[in-house]
Amino acid sequence: MTALFYLLFLTSVIIETHQECDMEKLDGDFPRQNNGYLYVCKDVETCFHICEERDLNRNHAKCCYENCFCEHLHGEKIRKQNVSLKI
């Protein structure tokens, strides 16, 4: 029982840390927010394209997949993320 509790605790710490780090890496007009949603790139190629437009190296923290938030509000390569969720 103790091992299960410890495993659940570690999992929640890792998830929370990952989510906090994602937001800490963003600045400027990232993320794009509209009507209570964030608009996030679905794939790494879209993210890299946005980073190249901003003259950012692909190894830059803002270009890590899932850290790159899209400027465009619509498109098949964009997903909506509810802002009310704790990020």
From Swiss-Prot:
Expressed by the venom gland. Its main location: secreted. One of its GO terms (molecular function) is sodium channel regulator activity. Residues 1-19 form the signal peptide. It comes from the Eukaryota. Disulfide bonds join C41-C63, C47-C68, C51-C70. GO terms for cellular component: extracellular region. It is found in: Secreted. The keyword Signal applies. Keywords: Disulfide bond, Ion channel impairing toxin, Neurotoxin, Secreted, Signal, Toxin, Voltage-gated sodium channel impairing toxin. InterPro entries: Scorpion_toxin-like_sf (IPR036574). Putative sodium channel toxin. This is Putative sodium channel toxin Ts40.
